[in-house]
């Protein structure tokens, strides 16, 4: 009987070791999920060149403003209005007269900027994207067909193709202790060197109403974040 119990205990320990090893392997795979290649379809943004040569999407954040100024100079006058020095708006886009738009900014074809939207600058709004009532954008790239339609804050963030933020969900971009943001995945850590870092959303991500994405949040493709969550941990694809 004693031998049987000891043997069972050893089996349990072995299983725990095996499970722990599997978890570590999964964590390493998850970290790869947060690269640009695994998060984003670069064919679904006018800002494709901004991401070239980089590994993680947050690496583009310090360069968005300068990139817009360079890219804007290359846009067709037949397709884009240029109402001020650092603002380009596609002629097919719909912009409410009550929207506040500060450059540098590019608003893509068929995009919609609704009543009282506030674009603070350094923003790229993709084709067919929606920036809604009282939504605020700052230093952000919205890929094509992104929707931030109701009372959202999107600062220092990248939102992948067809991602959607429910009403009142926000990207918190500064830690309360004002320290630099670190992306964590299990025991793995990546020092970003950034004080302001909102969220990185992969393609086809759904964020539920009223959720808060804390600084350094990275969400893999096709993930669903439930409503009213305070969310920090990275999410692998399809979770």
Stretch-by-stretch model annotation:
Residues 34-62, 71, 175-224, 230-233, ...:
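C-terminal segments of enzyme domains that contribute to small-molecule binding surfaces
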Residues 1-14, 231-239:
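Single conserved hydrophobic/aromatic residue that forms the stacking wall/gate
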Residues 9, 14-29:
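Short, Lys/Arg-enriched N-terminal segments with co-localized hydrophobic residues
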Residues 42-118, 122:
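Extended, small-residue-rich solenoid/repeat segments and analogous flexible loops
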Residues 72, 101-107, 113-207, 211-213:
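Flexible, glycine/small-residue-enriched loop-and-beta-strand segment within the central core
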Residues 10-12, 93, 111, 163:
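Short, small-hydrophobic-rich alpha-helical interface motif
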Residues 2, 25-28, 223, 230:
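Short, intrinsically disordered, charge-balanced linker/junction segments flanking boundaries
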